[in-house]
UniProtKB/Swiss-Prot annotation:
GO terms for molecular function: ATP binding; magnesium ion binding; selenide, water dikinase activity. InterPro entries: PurM-like_C_dom (IPR010918), PurM-like_C_sf (IPR036676), PurM-like_N (IPR016188), PurM-like_N_sf (IPR036921), SelD_I (IPR023061), SPS/SelD (IPR004536). Belongs to the selenophosphate synthase 1 family. Class I subfamily. Synthesizes selenophosphate from selenide and ATP. The active site is at residue 23. The gene is selD. This is Selenide, water dikinase. It comes from Shewanella sp. (strain MR-7). Keywords: ATP-binding, Kinase, Magnesium, Metal-binding, Nucleotide-binding, Selenium, Transferase. Pfam families: AIRS (PF00586), AIRS_C (PF02769). Mg(2+) binds at residues 57, 97, 233. Its EC number is 2.7.9.3. The lineage of its organism: Bacteria, Pseudomonadati, Pseudomonadota, Gammaproteobacteria, Alteromonadales. Its cofactor is Mg(2+). Homodimer.
């Protein structure tokens, strides 16, 4: 290791070694559209049940008439300074995509980029251990991985899962009349930006961490409810971005009750201090034309990039009580944030 390497693990603040944080590192939806516009002939496989057409949370491949294999990957730069916690959050976030399809994880492979001439290998070990801890909590093995020397720390997982095809949930299959539920509060981008700006108070340091370390394992149980018509997780594109994917995929309009959207404690306080991540502006620039006129305050909430955010559920009114009972049984507050209806305007999301 060079003389520029940090020798004391206690003095290392991982967020100072990256230009972005967590899912806020995501390439904006608009730029991503350009990247994915392939010039090659379209190749199809009838067994690929879910690919990239709807930008769903994971790919699903039909193994037989009953079982599908789910494949996904997610990785990003540090969103917290503690290496173990960073690894745990990154892994929890990656595993979430399996649950968002209604499946259960089977195993994971680690993805690690590390500036070996700037940061000790012992710190990378703690990051990987954090990922291993999340895998253990999900009941799976961290079965291997791949690493490269990179200018900034990067960590995540490639995760394989399985799903009973009768339980498969997608992000583009919602129906008019569905009610919208969110399983975690919004505001992770705001609080982690407060940390990066050194405004976060010590007593608030675990608010976002606790939310990001919570596995979305409830998704596998939600998927067994027949009246759940669509399911996705809310991550880097913010609540508005992922809700738009649901609306556009099903050709519906969301009637959103912004006052009902749950927020993390203290999120509004830090928002008032200007703690708005860059990803918020990139998100709005990418899809703001599909939203109603918003105040800066509303933009900051709806477009706030989440890392390891909650599940967004579209459920029929007939099955709503069953969903509420399930969430209550697992100590998740059931919060309805709106509904879906047949479009009456060009906006995909309207506020009520």
């Amino acid at each position: 290791m060079s003389n520029s390497a940090v020798s004391s693990a206690d003095s290392i603040k991982l967020t100072e070694y990256s230009h972005g944080a967590g899912c806020g590192c995501k390439i904006s939806p608009k730029v991503l559209t350009t990247i994915l516009a392939s010039q090659l002939p379209v190749f199809t496989d009838p067994n690929l049940l879910v690919g990239n057409q709807s930008r769903d949370d994971a790919a699903v491949y039909k193994l037989n008439d009953e079982i599908g294999i789910i494949s996904t990957t997610d990785f990003f730069m540090p969103i917290v300074d503690d290496p173990f916690t960073f690894g745990r959050i990154a892994a929890t976030n990656a595993i979430s995509d399996i649950y968002a399809m209604g499946g259960t994880p089977m195993m994971a492979i680690a993805i690690l980029g590390w500036p070996v001439n700037k940061l000790p290998a012992e710190i990378a070990q703690q990051v990987v251990d954090g990922g291993r801890q999340a895998c253990m909590e999900a009941g799976i093995m961290l079965a291997g991985g791949h690493s490269i020397d990179a200018p900034e720390p990067i960590f995540g997982l490639a995760v394989t899962g399985q799903i009973a095809l009768t339980d498969l949930k997608q992000n583009d299959t919602a129906k008019a009349g569905d009610r919208l539920y969110l399983t975690k509060p919004i505001g992770i981008g705001i609080l982690t930006t407060a940390q990066k700006q050194k405004k976060l108070k010590d007593e608030d340091s675990q608010i976002a961490v606790n939310a990001m370390c919570q596995l979305n394992s409830i998704g596998a149980k939600i998927a067994k409810i027949t009246g759940v018509n669509a399911l996705t997780d809310v991550t880097g594109f913010g609540l508005a971005g992922h809700l738009l994917e649901v609306c556009q995929g099903a050709k519906l309009t969301a009637k959103l009750d912004l006052d009902s959207v749950p927020l993390l404690p203290r999120a509004l306080d830090y928002l008032a201090q200007g703690c708005i991540p860059g990803g918020t502006h990139r998100n709005y620039d990418s899809y703001g034309e599909h939203l109603p006129a918003l105040t800066d305050h509303q933009k900051a909430i709806l477009c706030d990039p989440q890392t390891s955010g909650g599940l967004l559920v579209a459920v029929s009114s007939e099955a709503e009580a069953e969903l509420v009972a399930l969430l209550n049984a697992h100590q998740i507050e059931p919060i309805c944030i709106g509904s879906l209806e047949t479009p009456t305007s060009t906006a995909n999301v309207v506020l009520c």
